[in-house]
Regions:
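Nucleotide-activated donor-binding/catalytic signature segment of Leloir-type glycosyltransferases, i.e.
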Residues: 259-277
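Conserved acidic donor-binding segment of nucleotide-sugar-dependent glycosyltransferases
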Residues: 319, 331-343, 350-356
Length: 395
């Protein structure tokens, strides 16, 4: 089977002198604030500040606060890899070709894996002069996901030949791309605009509280129940003398069960469910956390929320020891835990709640580490990928 090898960024062409017209391609909608959407919007916003012309070629999208959105398809809601997402219905190739001819993009930056019904047709219609770049995001949560993606590889194999370079957001995504799609890629990590997080201040209602915070969808995979089980153990075994508050940020189908668990274990007075948190409010909630806990059991290709918390929280960030989160926190394994091991998590929380210096020590390392993921740092690497691909196409 043929391998499609991602080109390395070794061009000597200047990285700062040329304005590019860039089209981000995503089968899903921009209406949800999930990781891939955050990736292209964060990168796109930064690219515009650098003088580039940025467009979004996406599945069915209703929001009107973003410029240059081309909503190309109707989408249907599905569950995949224990996530809720939307998949495009087939798009007219003629319509796609007309858009590509009219806009005349320098670069199409496609999010992988992709559907043959939208992104696949954009790739197939790309003019010869246009560089096609990909970013691989997925980490499988089950064998079924592996099988489904092998089938997707067969369906998109022809379009994959058109790519000039492929990146993966982490080593776990890189391995999956190689094993399932026979794509050799370069790891270029996810990125965050750190500015709103590093300058965030705690919400006034939590300013004087000792807090443990969870932020994410209230679904089984994100592991909020395991955090509550650890909190219940802390209380039942009197592991901590200091009073503290647990803040649960997010909505989802598990909310009723989580509230019921809190009441059954008599921790409802220390647990606050605040519901869905907007992107504008998220930095302040994270800044209110003495300990931010993300007990995801798997299916994570990276951990954008970890970076956001590392940049803004006033204490330690802990992550479930899945491959995606480990790619961010691996240098300090004491910040990783087996998410279903509530005894281990309870002990980690007890140690951090009792010891403010331990929290400060973790925070100092995390604040230093997260700067490597700031969008000006990662963005420059990606622009070099764009220009290297264009240089090769021009030869």
């Amino acid at each position: 089977m043929k391998r499609y090898t991602a080109m390395r960024s070794n061009s000597t062409r200047s990285s700062s002198s040329t304005s590019l017209k860039i089209g981000f391609v995503l089968d899903d909608s921009l209406d949800t604030p999930d990781g891939v959407q955050q990736y292209i919007l964060t990168l796109g916003t930064w690219l515009k500040t650098q003088g580039h012309d940025v467009h979004y070629l996406v599945g069915q999208t209703r929001r009107t606060d973003i410029q240059n959105v081309h909503s190309l398809s109707r989408n249907v809601k599905v569950r995949f890899n224990k996530n809720r997402m939307s998949m495009p219905l087939p798009v007219s190739q003629k319509r796609v070709n007309e858009l590509l001819r009219r806009e005349d993009f320098d670069v199409l930056h496609v999010q992988l894996p992709f559907s043959p019904f939208l992104a696949g047709r954009v790739v197939r219609g790309a003019p010869d002069r246009t560089a096609v770049i990909g970013t691989f995001h997925i980490a499988p949560h089950s064998r079924l996901v592996h099988i489904a993606n092998r089938l997707l590889h067969v369906m998109t194999r022809r379009a994959l030949r058109r790519f000039d370079a492929v990146m993966s957001v982490s080593s776990v995504a890189q391995i999956f791309a190689e094993q399932t799609f026979r794509i050799t890629s370069q790891v270029v990590p996810n990125t965050v605009d750190l500015a709103p997080y590093t300058r965030a201040v705690p919400l006034p209602q939590y300013k004087n509280d000792l807090t443990v915070l969870f932020l994410g969808r209230l679904v089984e995979r994100k592991g909020c129940l395991y955090l509550l089980k650890a909190i219940a153990r802390l209380k039942q075994e009197n592991m901590v003398d200091q009073p503290f508050k647990v803040i649960i940020c997010g909505k989802g189908p598990q909310e009723a069960a989580l509230r019921k668990f809190a009441m059954a274990h008599k921790i409802e007075n220390m647990v606050e469910f605040v519901g869905f948190v907007t992107e504008e409010d998220k930095p302040r909630y994270l800044a209110s956390a003495d300990i931010a806990v993300f007990p995801s059991t798997g299916g994570e290709s990276f951990g954008i929320v970890l970076l956001e918390a590392m940049a803004s929280s006033r204490g330690a960030v802990l992550g479930g020891n899945n491959p995606g989160y480990a790619s961010v926190l691996h240098e300090h394994p004491e910040t990783l835990f087996a998410p279903r091991n509530t005894e281990e998590l309870a002990a980690m929380l007890a140690g951090l709640l009792r010891d403010p210096e331990l929290r400060r020590k973790a925070h100092r390392w995390q604040l230093s580490e997260v700067r490597h993921y700031d969008v000006p740092v990662v963005g420059k690497t990606i622009v070099e990928q764009y220009k290297a691909a264009l240089h090769k196409r021009a030869q």
